[in-house]
């Protein structure tokens, strides 16, 4: 069955994001074959794009620059941690901390190009003001099959003597801030639904509700080897 388009967005965890997306040597040492299936010989098919307009390829530096921008624009420090406040009815309400950098996992086709995903990112920026900072296409992740694939499985292929089912996806890292006001962009449920449709239209895929099991496995893989580290960004 063909993969349907979907994008699932979460607050960015800078430490695990960059290590996973860039396939750093440390990350590859940490993951271990039993915890994540990345096939190194397929990694040459991966592609990446870094937005040149922000002057730094490092998310940590960009995050710090956002904190400074928020302070200059609003006169207040950026609220990074979850906090509590009392509502009008006296009940305690938890308020999430600011998530200035967010990351989307976008399911793609085997022949999806970097240009396709860049077009998606550019359209998101035009419509909602969220700016793509980094884009990574990953075509080296998936899982090994126990034996041969089913007859209807047209995606799995052989690597050596084993059959591999790929999980083609892209990571799109967004700056979620309005740099004129120093405030976070606000997207509602309708906006997010429109984004799903936008992905299917641009990537020429059938629109689908996020296949959460597939998307969650990607997130879990991304943080599994770095679980002991403290995130640099709220998740």
Locate predicted features.
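N-terminal nicking endonuclease/strand-transfer module with a His-rich metal-binding environment
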Residues: 1-235
């Amino acid at each position: 069955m063909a993969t349907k388009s979907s994008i699932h967005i979460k607050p960015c965890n800078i430490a695990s994001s960059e290590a996973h997306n860039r396939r750093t040597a440390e990350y590859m040492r940490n993951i271990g074959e039993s915890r994540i299936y990345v096939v190194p010989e397929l990694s040459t098919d991966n592609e990446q794009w870094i937005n040149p307009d922000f002057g730094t390829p490092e998310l940590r530096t960009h995050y710090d620059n956002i904190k400074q921008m928020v302070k200059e624009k609003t006169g207040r420090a950026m609220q990074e941690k979850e906090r509590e406040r009392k509502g009008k009815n006296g009940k305690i309400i938890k308020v999430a901390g600011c998530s200035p950098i967010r990351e989307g996992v976008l399911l793609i086709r085997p022949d999806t190009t970097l240009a396709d995903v860049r077009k998606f990112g550019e359209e998101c920026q035009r419509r909602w003001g969220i700016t793509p900072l980094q884009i990574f296409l990953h075509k080296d992740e998936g899982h090994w099959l126990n034996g041969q694939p089913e007859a209807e499985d047209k995606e799995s292929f052989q690597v050596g003597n084993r059959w591999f089912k790929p999980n083609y996806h892209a990571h799109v890292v967004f700056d979620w801030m309005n740099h004129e006001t120093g405030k976070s962009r606000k997207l509602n449920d309708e906006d997010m639904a429109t984004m799903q449709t936008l992905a299917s239209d641009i990537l020429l895929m059938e629109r689908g509700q996020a296949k959460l099991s597939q998307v969650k496995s990607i997130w879990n893989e991304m943080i599994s080897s770095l679980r002991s580290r403290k995130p640099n960004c709220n998740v």
